[in-house]
Amino acid sequence: MTITPQHLIALLPLLIVGLTVVVVMLSIAWRRNHFLNATLSVIGLNAALVSLWFVGQAGAMDVTPLMRVDGFAMLYTGLVLLASLATCTFAYPWLEGYNDNQEEFYLLVLIAALGGILLANANHLAALFLGIELISLPLFGLIGYAFRQKRSLEASIKYTILSAAASSFLLFGMALVYAQSGNLSFVALGKSLGDGMLHEPLLLAGFGLMIVGLGFKLSLVPFHLWTPDVYQGAPAPVSTFLATASKIAIFGVVMRLFLYAPVGDSEAVRIVLGVIAFASIIFGNLMALSQTNIKRLLGYSSISHLGYLLVALIALQSGEMSMEAVGVYLAGYLFSSLGAFGVVSLMSSPFRGPDADSLFSYRGLFWHRPILAAVMTVMMLSLAGIPMTLGFIGKFYVLAVGVQASLWWLVAAVVVGSAIGLYYYLRVAVSLYLSAPQQLNRDAPSNWQYSAGGIVVLISALLVLVLGIYPQPLISIVQLATPLM
């Protein structure tokens, strides 16, 4: 297949981020300058975001058999780039106090962003696997970046070993799917499944193994055991990336796979996914109840959020509202998580050893950093799905999709899970307004709102509130991005 100028325009975000990786690498080799390399990374990610406008003008097209660039790919590419940009801005003040190599952090984030963009555009199982590896490998280094901290190193080793095992399951599953169908392309797989091949034991075994591999990457129950330890051990800016960009990119490609290859038509697959969704919602929320560490709490809550999204995925065959529900929910989850982890990053900067992730560190925050406490409150309310926040709109969509598809037991799980979640999110919010301890262990810088990370946190809070009250602009963007069904 010949690559035309139109194809190059469609691949602009991928090419720009790839070029930024090379530029930052050469810059580090030439001269170590933290500010310069952070600026280059942010400029590259912003340029990739702006280039999405030109991609939109070029229209939908297949670029090689591996990738399809369309509205859907643009939406998920945009979300991944926003998460990567936020990670870099949160990391800068954190790295200011870090005495080892600072610049490589941005290099690893850019390579992981490259993997996320590839996943958003993937239209083939080979591209899916390459994207997942490209996003996972830099995370091994990022999670263990504070390697002098025992917990960070332990989290990195744990994630590396389990991720390698999950990748082998995924690859073996793909091999079985290929052995039975003779295809790896999503569209060709869809045609094979349409010919009644879906009930072949080998194909079902292949999809089963793929669910194990992808379930690990998305930290769904029972493949979730790494999640709380890794979220707690990783530096706060890395936990931000882990909770947002990697989950969004992988869930996006799973949506596309289910869209073209209607795996959900198999009753066996639907039951397995339903049980995983139910267990993730209930278990994730129950485990978060007893947490006194904010990063662990957000780790367990991310398990339940992916469970909610899985409900929309199971209902995908019932109509295009599922696509809309996932897009809106992921946007709400992105901004809410960026705000919550952003506050933790600001409180933990500059690097002084362990992060400020104990719930006690946030007790009485309102009395000395009122705006920061207000931002954290908004994020907790949005994650809990309280009306007038973007989180509520996403949860409402998921419930509507579940009702439309008559998935009553999963709808009940969403309602019960949300009720449990309300308790621990409000527990964090209430602690912000209690009387402050006499001596502060950790505190955000006094001028935090003028830093790049502070601005990102404030914008996230504003978007969560504005789009929670008037979600139409976001819904319109998501509808434009889902003309596939």
Curated annotation (Swiss-Prot):
Q: What is its main location?
A: membrane
Q: Which InterPro entries match?
A: NADH-Q_OxRdtase_suN/2, ND/Mrp_TM
Q: What reaction(s) does this enzyme catalyze?
A: a quinone + NADH + 5 H(+)(in) = a quinol + NAD(+) + 4 H(+)(out)
Per the record, what is one GO cellular component?
A: plasma membrane
Q: What does the record give as EC number? A: 7.1.1.-
Q: Where in the cell is it found?
A: Cell inner membrane
**Into which EC class is this enzyme placed?**
translocase
Question: One GO molecular function term?
Answer: quinone binding
Keywords on record: Cell inner membrane, Cell membrane, Membrane, NAD, Quinone, Translocase, Transmembrane, Transmembrane helix, Transport, Ubiquinone
From the UniProt record, give one GO term of the biological process aspect.
ATP synthesis coupled electron transport
Asked if the record carries the keyword Electron transport, the reply is no
Q: Which residues cross the membrane?
A: 8-28, 35-55, 71-91, 105-125, 127-147, 159-179, 203-223, 235-255, 271-291, 297-317, 326-346, 373-393, 408-430, 455-475
Q: Give a yes or no for keyword DNA damage in this entry.
A: no
**Membrane-protein topology:** Multi-pass membrane protein
Q: How does it assemble?
A: NDH-1 is composed of 13 different subunits. Subunits NuoA, H, J, K, L, M, N constitute the membrane sector of the complex.
Q: Name the family the entry cites.
A: Belongs to the complex I subunit 2 family.
Briefly state the protein's biological role.
NDH-1 shuttles electrons from NADH, via FMN and iron-sulfur (Fe-S) centers, to quinones in the respiratory chain. The immediate electron acceptor for the enzyme in this species is believed to be ubiquinone. Couples the redox reaction to proton translocation (for every two electrons transferred, four hydrogen ions are translocated across the cytoplasmic membrane), and thus conserves the redox energy in a proton gradient.
Name by which UniProt lists this protein: NADH-quinone oxidoreductase subunit N
- Provide the species name: Citrobacter koseri (strain ATCC BAA-895 / CDC 4225-83 / SGSC4696)
List the lineage, top down.
Bacteria, Pseudomonadati, Pseudomonadota, Gammaproteobacteria, Enterobacterales
